[in-house]
Amino acid sequence: MIIKKSGGRWQLSLLASVVISAFFLNTAYAWQQEYIVDTQPGLSTERYTWDSDHQPDYNDILSQRIQSSQRALGLEVNLAEETPVDVTSSMSMGWNFPLYEQVTTGPVAALHYDGTTTSMYNEFGDSTTTLTDPLWHASVSTLGWRVDSRLGDLRPWAQISYNQQFGENIWKAQSGLSRMTATNQNGNWLDVTVGADMLLNQNIAAYAALTQAENTTNNSDYLYTMGVSARF
């Protein structure tokens, strides 16, 4: 830029304005933005930075998020969601330690409970201020042992679990629905589950599992689960 000589305070003022403007322009261009991803508890926070010349690669970010969802070594704790979509809430914890090369194992424990609000109408007289029947909210605890392995992108796993229903052995339904008697229900049971997870690509993962349980009364001894998932 060429500045003509004009003399006086106007020239000095113009020169100062150009210098200050150039300072702010360079500062704005070099300012970096930061994208923070919170990984599983116990893992360090991953950070992704970029500027106008280095835009973020969201495919890499998504791939790392899927990878972080796999079981890591050490203590793992999963707390219940504060605002779950489903009224049934769960919390779990486990300890995963290496066994041999790509094989890890460890104990697992979980608690599943009904988070239905007591303000709903039922034939037992429950309300927001009075809970006449504490068994309206059922819960089931699980204690088991799990083995995980890895064969490339395929992650086979197996788990054996002991499940115990807390409280009296009666599931109570809403008014107008039939209830099963205690003799037709199971207070505790064992189940064995085998499954596998696999990354189809850097954006999508597939999973499948087969569970066999004992003491079932509806002749459904097996439970099949299969699907795909993507984490954003």
Swiss-Prot record:
Residues 1-232 form the Autotransporter domain. GO terms for cellular component: outer membrane. Pfam families: Autotransporter (PF03797). Disruption phenotype: Increased biofilm formation. Transmembrane segments: none annotated. SUPFAM superfamilies: Autotransporter. This is Uncharacterized protein YhjY. The lineage of its organism: Bacteria, Pseudomonadati, Pseudomonadota, Gammaproteobacteria, Enterobacterales. The gene is yhjY.
